[in-house]
UniProtKB/Swiss-Prot annotation:
SUPFAM superfamilies in the cross-refs: YebC-like
Source organism phylogeny: Bacteria, Bacillati, Actinomycetota, Actinomycetes, Micrococcales
GO-annotated cellular components: cytosol
Organism: Renibacterium salmoninarum (strain ATCC 33209 / DSM 20767 / JCM 11484 / NBRC 15589 / NCIMB 2235)
Similarity comment: Belongs to the TACO1 family.
Protein name: Probable transcriptional regulatory protein RSal33209_2002
C-alpha cells in the first residue's frame, strides 16, 4: 500500500463517506487557502493553487467556496489564517510505521489531539526521524481500475516519468517523482484515462502485512486520525492481502 488508498476504499470507509464529506471539503479548502497565501491568488502563476483547486473541483467543492478560500488565503477578506504543516511519526499494530501530516493554526491542539488518537487506539508516538526514513516523497495519481489493464496504463504514462503502477484494491496508483505529476496528468488525459486524485505523498520503502485482527486495529487507528480536523493525510507501510481485505469488507 503506497500510503492510504487501500484503507480508504474498503466498504467500511464507503459506509461513512457521506458523514465525512464536510470534513473532506474543509481539508481541501484549507489547502487552497495555504496555496493562495504562499503563492498569491493567480492560478496561472501559482501551480500549487491550481493543483489545490483542481482537487477541490474533482471532489465537487462548490465554486463559491473555492473562490472565498482563494480570497481568504490571499488576504482579500482580511487577515489570512497562518496555517503550519507539521509531520508526526508513530507506530501502529505489528510495528507498522505511520506518518501523520497536519495542517493547523494551533500546533498545541494538533499535537494533543494526534497523541490522544494514537494512544487510545493501540499506537505509540515516535521521535522525529524514527519512521520517516522508511518513506520517500513521491507523486501519486490514483484512478479506478474499471476495465483498464495495468499494462495499458503503464504504456500510457511510462514516457511521462512514471516509475511504477500499483494495484491498490479497486484502484491503480501511478508512482512518480513529485515534479513529474503534471506530465503524468497530461499523459492520462491524452490517453482518455480519467483519474480520481493526484498529489505528492509519502510512499513506504517496505511494507508490513497485517493479519485480520491487526488490520481491524489499524483501521480503528486510521479512522481516528482521519477524523481529526487538523490531520490532512495519514501514510503508513501497513498492507493487507486480498483475503484479509475481503474479511474486513464483510464486517
Amino acid at each position: 500500500m503506497s500510503g492510504h488508498s487501500k484503507w480508504a476504499t474498503t466498504k467500511h470507509k464507503k459506509a461513512v463517506i457521506d458523514g465525512r464529506r464536510a470534513k473532506s471539503f474543509a481539508k481541501l479548502i484549507k489547502n487552497i487557502e495555504v496555496a493562495a497565501r504562499v503563492g498569491g491568488p493567480d492560478m496561472a502563476g501559482n501551480p500549487a493553487l491550481e493543483l489545490a483547486v483542481t482537487k477541490a473541483k474533482k471532489t465537487s467543492v462548490p465554486n463559491d467556496n473555492i473562490d472565498r478560500a482563494i480570497k481568504r488565503g490571499s488576504g482579500q477578506l482580511g487577515e489570512a489564517i497562518d496555517y503550519q504543516t507539521i509531520m508526526y511519526e508513530g507506530y501502529g499494530p505489528q510495528g507498522t510505521a505511520i506518518l501523520i501530516e497536519c495542517l493547523t493554526d494551533n500546533k498545541n491542539r494538533a499535537a494533543s489531539e494526534v497523541r490522544l488518537a494514537v494512544s487510545r487506539n493501540g499506537g505509540n508516538m515516535a521521535d522525529p526521524g524514527s519512521v520517516s526514513y522508511l518513506f520517500a516523497r513521491k507523486g501519486i495519481v490514483s484512478l479506478p481500475q474499471n476495465e483498464l489493464s495495468e499494462d495499458d496504463l503503464l504504456m500510457a504514462v511510462l514516457d511521462a516519468g512514471a516509475e511504477e503502477v500499483k494495484s491498490e484494491g479497486e484502484n491503480f496508483e501511478v508512482i512518480s517523482e513529485p515534479q513529474d505529476l503534471p506530465a503524468i496528468r497530461s499523459a492520462l488525459t491524452e490517453a482518455g484515462i480519467e483519474y480520481d486524485t493526484d498529489d505528492a505523498g509519502f510512499v513506504p520503502s517496505m511494507q508490513v502485512e497485517l493479519d485480520v485482527e491487526n488490520a481491524k486495529k489499524f483501521m480503528r487507528l486510521y479512522d481516528a486520525l482521519e477524523d481529526l480536523d487538523d490531520v490532512q493525510n495519514v501514510y503508513s507501510n501497513a498492507d493487507v492481502s486480498a483475503e484479509v481485505m475481503a474479511q474486513l469488507d464483510e464486517d
